[in-house]
Amino acid sequence: MIDAKSEHKIAPWKIEEVNALKELLKSTSIIALIDMMEVPAVQLQEIRDKIRDQMTLKMSRNTLMKRAIEEVAEETGNPEFAKLADYLDKGAAIIATEMNPFKLFKTLDESKSPAPVKGGATAPCDIEVKAGSTGMPPGPFLSELKAVGIPAAIDKGKIGIKEDKVVVKEGEVVSQKLAVVLSALGIKPVTVGLNVLGVYEDGVIYTESDLKIDEEEFIGKIQKAYTSAFNLSVNAVIPTSATIETIVQKAFNDAKAVSVESAFVTDKTADAILGKAYAQMIAVAGLAGDDALDEELIEKMSSGAAAPVEEAPVEEKKEEKKEEAAPAAGLGMLF
């Protein structure tokens, strides 16, 4: 906190700003630091409009944000929160929200938009100008195109580009003249938006590399892990709330199969045992001659009235598939 001895040395507006930042930092459970250094004013306003209802964005001086973070950490007895100040960089700003870090990152990433490249900037990729009409009438722009190495000529009363041309390769510096031409052609090779520096949640600070994940791959891994754990629980007979029903069903089916195979009669297996014995009798009778059989058995064999063998149903796989779908149910909440 700013003490009384030093207050007279600090501009009142700075004290008010730090206090306002502290209120913001205490207002939500999720606090993010974002970099908005390279975001033009027009794009920044568009982004603000997109995220206004989901989070609060506040810009300030890095020194004041650092002080506010450290004071909140001290006042709340939370030294882990103070580490968030280590992520202050460039043109940082604070976002306060209740949105979980992964969903916050996705929302900010989706709010990014294409923008023209600035002169003196490094090309983020190979920048190519496509052949075709520019839609512009003959004039000075024709000379500007040629000056930056773009083959152009008048075609049907309009300035046209003769062929596809890579005007700057990834990693090269874009000249001011080329930047002006690309902007005039409506080419926007740069993606601008709010980049995450660090997100604090419940004692943990996430960086962009932590939050930038392939959702389908991530969910697939969780589903695979769940399936493996489910099968291990069933096969090792380690009951859980998710597997107890399948374990009991598997045990019942295994016991029933043993009972039938060993001819150990129970009220659950009597029919299956008798059916199996009957089928075996008919099979043996079929190998014997008619002289060895009585008339009733011969009649049954000729009519094909052999009783079907009842087999113990195997249901655990069906149940496994039913259970496997469960882990995906709540994963959407992360994103």
Curated annotation (Swiss-Prot):
Keywords of this entry: Ribonucleoprotein, Ribosomal protein, RNA-binding, rRNA-binding
Biased composition regions of type Basic and acidic residues, renumbered to the chain: 314-325
Gene Ontology cellular component terms for the protein in this record: cytosolic large ribosomal subunit
Transmembrane regions: none
CDD domains for this protein: Ribosomal_P0_L10e
Region (Disordered): 304-335
A GO molecular-function annotation: structural constituent of ribosome
GO biological process, alphabetically ordered: cytoplasmic translation; ribosomal large subunit assembly
Subunit and partners: Part of the 50S ribosomal subunit. Forms part of the ribosomal stalk which helps the ribosome interact with GTP-bound translation factors. Forms a heptameric L10(L12)2(L12)2(L12)2 complex, where L10 forms an elongated spine to which the L12 dimers bind in a sequential fashion.
Stated family: Belongs to the universal ribosomal protein uL10 family.
Role description: Forms part of the ribosomal stalk, playing a central role in the interaction of the ribosome with GTP-bound translation factors.
Protein name stated in the entry: Large ribosomal subunit protein uL10
UniProt source species: Methanococcus maripaludis (strain C7 / ATCC BAA-1331)
Species lineage: Archaea, Methanobacteriati, Methanobacteriota, Methanomada group, Methanococci
